[in-house]
UniProtKB/Swiss-Prot annotation:
Membrane topology label: Multi-pass membrane protein
Free-text function comment from the UniProt entry: Acts as a regulator of endoplasmic reticulum (ER) and nuclear envelope (NE) morphogenesis. Affects the ratio between tubular ER and ER sheets by promoting sheet formation at the expense of tubules. Influences NE expansion, nuclear pore complex formation and proper localization of inner nuclear membrane proteins.
Subunit structure: Interacts with RTN4.
Transmembrane segments: 51-71, 86-106, 117-137
Gene Ontology cellular component terms for the protein in this record: endoplasmic reticulum membrane; nuclear envelope
InterPro entries: Transmembrane_pr_170 (IPR019334)
Segments in the Lumenal topological domain: 1-50, 107-116
Organism of provenance: Homo sapiens (Human)
Major site of localization recorded for this protein: endoplasmic reticulum
Subcellular location: Endoplasmic reticulum membrane; Nucleus envelope
Pfam families registered for this protein in UniProt: Tmemb_170
Glycan-modified residues: 30, 36
Protein's name in the database: Transmembrane protein 170A
Amino acid sequence: MEREGSGGSGGSAGLLQQILSLKVVPRVGNGTLCPNSTSLCSFPEMWYGVFLWALVSSLFFHVPAGLLALFTLRHHKYGRFMSVSILLMGIVGPITAGILTSAAIAGVYRAAGKEMIPFEALTLGTGQTFCVLVVSFLRILATL
């Protein structure tokens, strides 16, 4: 029995639908033994789910901040480059540190033999971004 989105003629449309519907990692050939089809059971599924939400939530905060910096500092000689650094930190931060922390979270879940529902991945990924924002704000506040 072939699962929807696992290949064939409509495979790419089913794969895209599966990724966009919070079923984060496409299951090709039903290689996992999850009792629930919506839960994330394997390490790559959990890691990718948490990492993706950390990246998206980081961009959600850094893109408006970068655009605001670009708009307000557009006439400054060197200040206009601050917006580029804000945007880069919104991408580079989750890619470097987010990969490691998401792998640690997924490793703990996997070692405990626990499944992760997509809402937990959303909470843990956005929680990482929230912690980064709090630490960044407190660092700036300490310099004033």
